[in-house]
Amino acid sequence: MSASPKERCFSFGKDQRLLNSSDFTPVFNDAPIRASNSEILILCKLSTTGKARLGLVVAKKNIKHANKRNQFKRIARESFRLKQHKLPPIDAIVLARRGADSLSKVELRRMFDGLWKRVVKKAEKLTATQPEKTG
């Protein structure tokens, strides 16, 4: 049974993930786009791959129980997967802060929705202020 085209466009494949330190380091070193609240921080940098990509950093120090860490990561991936077609080509890192484990699933989803909207606005503003590169 093959997936319909509509299902395929919302996939979250390996090419949409930040997988190793060489993917994460440029974003940590220079993230011109930031969106945060008291429990979640999203760092973003415009990507050269032409796709939005996601990396997750969920420390045991901030979310003690493994089931809560996994739940946080699942909700983060799902929100990214559903919003990926609205996002510009960015490399995004989602970091969990202290207190994120006390949020309900509904609160987490709502927070991620708001943060992704802020990321889109900031990315649009950043691309509008950057001069076009001519080669």
Swiss-Prot record:
Q: Reply yes or no: does the keyword Electron transport apply.
A: no
Question: What reaction does this catalyse?
Answer: Endonucleolytic cleavage of RNA, removing 5'-extranucleotides from tRNA precursor
Alphabetized Gene3D superfamilies for the sequence? 3.30.230.10
Tell me which InterPro entries the record gives.
Ribosomal_Su5_D2-typ_SF, Ribsml_uS5_D2-typ_fold_subgr, RNase_P, RNase_P_CS
A single Pfam family it belongs to is: Ribonuclease_P
The record's Gene Ontology biological-process terms are: tRNA 5'-leader removal
Known EC number(s)? 3.1.26.5
Q: Which GO terms describe its molecular function?
A: 3'-tRNA processing endoribonuclease activity; ribonuclease P activity; tRNA binding
Gene Ontology CC entries for this record:
ribonuclease P complex
Q: What class of enzyme is it?
A: hydrolase
Query: What keywords is this UniProt entry annotated with?
Result: Endonuclease, Hydrolase, Nuclease, RNA-binding, tRNA processing
What is annotated about its quaternary structure and interactions?
Consists of a catalytic RNA component (M1 or rnpB) and a protein subunit.
- PANTHER family listed in its UniProt record: RIBONUCLEASE P PROTEIN COMPONENT
Question: What family is reported?
Answer: Belongs to the RnpA family.
HAMAP family listed in its UniProt record: RNase_P (MF_00227)
**Its function?**
RNaseP catalyzes the removal of the 5'-leader sequence from pre-tRNA to produce the mature 5'-terminus. It can also cleave other RNA substrates such as 4.5S RNA. The protein component plays an auxiliary but essential role in vivo by binding to the 5'-leader sequence and broadening the substrate specificity of the ribozyme.
Q: What is the protein's given name?
A: Ribonuclease P protein component
Query: Which gene produces this protein?
Result: rnpA
